[in-house]
Amino acid sequence: MKQSIIRAVFGCISLISASLMAQTPIVAPIALNNTAVNSDNNTKSNQVIFIVRHAEKFAGKDPSLSAQGQLRALRLAKVLSSTHLDKVYTTDYNRTRETATAVTQDQQVDLSVYDPRDMAAFTQHLLTQQGNILVVGHSNTSTDLVEGLGAEKQIPIADASEFDRLYIVTLNANKQMVSTVLLRY
């Protein structure tokens, strides 16, 4: 317990330092208590799905992350460092895989690929999975996924300039949405 608190504090300190140097908004590492009590007073686990758009990229057909994008990918790993992830999904593009790399290395979890052309099928697949999940997508898929999991209509992501949304969708044991939170990282 003490070690996790100390890790969270040091994670916050390094995140604050990096944010001050980069002049970006500060989002602290997220630590989740994944239990909820249902109406029968039985404890059941919630599932948390984190959804982000890939970080900043170079131009081109299948570009890699820019230097700013690489920093944002590291920031994402810091933000999620206090939360155990069971699965990480990306599309089969350099920019999404590179955004998830620091997280998969830090969490020692494998990366799985999904097809962004069939978000309905992927959403249904997510609902069959257990544990906490990170999904790295695109400006035209991230909000669709959030809505597909039960959230209200989302404001579209500004394609050229918006890379900092972190949606946190919490589902109960019956796979019903409990809450949706939008953070900036």
Model-predicted segments: where are they?
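Short beta-strand segments
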Residues: 136-138
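Boundary at the C-terminal end of the N-terminal hydrophobic targeting segment
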Residues: 20-22
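Short SAM/SAH-binding signature in class I
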Residues: 132-134
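Active-site-proximal alpha-helix that buttresses catalytic centers in soluble enzyme cores
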Residues: 24-126, 130, 142-185
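Bacterial N-terminal signal peptides that target proteins for export
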Residues: 1-12
